[in-house]
């Protein structure tokens, strides 16, 4: 397992329907609404992701594990592929909820630094 000195969490969407026991969704959503407003979009676009990535050095690892199921944002597979093609090291933490077969075909050859698949505790 590769340990990077610098990592940044990528949260491609605010709000998650998995309701995992360890995840503070209510706190996250409350803070988001306080700071950003409730009328703002909760999905990160691929274009916004690319803009953010253009300011980030390549030695910084990307962790797609920021209090959301990443695949609830339909652009996440394209974000993952773009980041990988740009040379970033990627950690993905997912329940696979929202992932379609066509999405899997896009990302199946990505050499993830770490790939964690877990069950959503709220789904039992």
Model-predicted segments: where are they?
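Short acidic, glycine/proline-enriched helix-loop-strand junctions
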Residues: 93, 123-124
